């Protein structure tokens, strides 16, 4: 959907995104005129599983299998001499982040945040390239924060560099084929190669060119690349920031990223991810689903599919199984809760559509009894931004990990043959019905 009218990147652009979300409309948006920049802004690329499927030229139910297969059968990048990302090169005194239409999303955000950038850095241990999305607050025309969660690969790489007393060269890629952002959500070992996963998703190698000011290759066909280094001897306050929990994350120290160059296409399009919108949650949840599905498949042979719904802010997982024995639902819920830091796992039968929150709620209300179907696991590690998490050591201790009580719900029907059948017209009739024959 084209937005031809002029919009301000400070709140107004995100207000359009929010209003459409409230109206249950999630089109890909291109804002053609953004105050203060010549670049258009595109958003909502990952607003739903359907969007992800379109990007990967598949169907929604095949997104996760395709993603996990690409992680196993990666295709390494290839080096080329040049590419469109070199059309415009801003280095030295010409470096100015203000040329980019970086958006301020929420009323109390600390400032404009780069929310879609895929940061590429080299792992000093393996020598391989690592890619991940981290949030970046603009602190000056030449500096950003680099806010990385404590357990992510980027944070580990920076910590290793800090011990060795050197900085980390990095490149922030803003805008490329959606497969790059999708691949960056890969969870697992630090040695895993996200750029190889992207190649497998595209069925061709990712073209890379040498950066201008750092010793790294960067994607040749990117819209924008911000080159620089992550300081390992200096920190800056980052926040407040509207996060995927849909609350403000409080200010916390983050590493400083010093910009040494900005390169971009002549007709570059800036990609923005609405930080408190479905796009953030859908993309973020993709990585969880990939790793959890792979782990659960080994523990739950009758697993059919999983879904991390947007409504759960990354803390809820639906698990669909082909139940053969009573008790399998509880076992599947325990396995799901152990596979990731979900606060709640709901297990349903194969006749329940896990991509429809209403159908899952229906199963919970008609196939469970609280004293038999629901269990709790106290004292489990939870996300550092959980507003209900409690410190492990003592109240108010900022260094303590946050803990939570996890909830498992077995919403599968008992195998007792006396349990009633679902009432509906003949399933084969309505599932294969061509409505065009009846509706005009």
Predicted region positions:
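Extended, highly charged
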Residues: 1-256, 261-440
């Amino acid at each position: 959907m084209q937005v031809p009218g002029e919009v301000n990147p400070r709140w107004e652009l995100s207000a359009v995104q929010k209003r459409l979300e409230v109206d249950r409309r999630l089109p890909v948006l291109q804002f053609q005129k953004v105050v203060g920049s010549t670049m258009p802004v595109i958003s909502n690329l990952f607003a739903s599983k359907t969007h992800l499927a379109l990007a990967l030229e598949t169907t929604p139910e095949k997104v996760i299998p395709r993603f996990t297969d690409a992680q196993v059968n990666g295709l390494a990048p290839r080096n080329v001499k040049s590419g469109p990302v070199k059309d415009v090169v801003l280095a030295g005194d010409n470096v100015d982040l203000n040329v980019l239409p970086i958006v301020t999303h929420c009323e109390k955000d600390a400032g404009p945040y780069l929310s879609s950038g895929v940061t590429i850095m080299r792992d000093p241990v393996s020598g391989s390239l690592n890619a991940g999305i981290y949030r970046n607050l603009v602190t000056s025309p030449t500096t950003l924060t680099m806010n990385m969660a404590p357990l992510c690969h980027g944070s580990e790489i920076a910590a290793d560099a800090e011990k060795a007393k050197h900085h980390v060269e990095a490149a922030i890629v803003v805008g490329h084929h959606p497969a790059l952002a999708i691949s960056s959500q890969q969870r697992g070992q630090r040695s895993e190669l996200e750029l190889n996963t992207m190649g497998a998703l595209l069925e061709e190698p990712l073209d890379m060119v040498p950066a201008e000011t750092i010793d790294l290759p960067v994607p040749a066909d990117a819209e924008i690349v911000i080159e620089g280094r992550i300081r390992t001897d200096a920190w800056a306050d980052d926040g407040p920031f509207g996060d995927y929990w849909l609350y403000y994350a409080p200010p916390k120290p983050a590493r400083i990223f010093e910009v040494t160059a900005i390169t971009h296409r002549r007709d570059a399009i800036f990609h923005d991810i609405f930080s408190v919108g479905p796009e953030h949650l859908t993309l973020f949840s993709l990585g969880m689903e990939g790793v959890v599905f792979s782990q659960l498949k080994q523990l739950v042979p009758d697993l059919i599919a999983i879904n991390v719904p947007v409504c759960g802010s990354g803390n809820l997982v639906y698990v669909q199984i082909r139940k053969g024995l009573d008790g399998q639902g509880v076992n599947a819920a325990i396995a799901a809760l152990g596979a990731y830091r979900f606060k709640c796992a709901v297990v349903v039968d194969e006749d329940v559509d896990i991509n429809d929150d209403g159908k899952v709620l229906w199963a919970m209300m008609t196939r469970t009894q609280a004293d038999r179907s629901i269990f709790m696991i106290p004292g489990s590690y939870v996300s550092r931004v959980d507003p209900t998490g409690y410190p492990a050591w003592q109240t108010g201790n900022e260094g303590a990990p946050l803990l939570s009580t996890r909830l498992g719900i077995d919403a599968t029907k008992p195998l007792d043959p006396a349990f009633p059948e679902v009432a509906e017209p003949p399933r084969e009739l309505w599932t294969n019905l061509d409505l065009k024959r009846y509706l005009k």
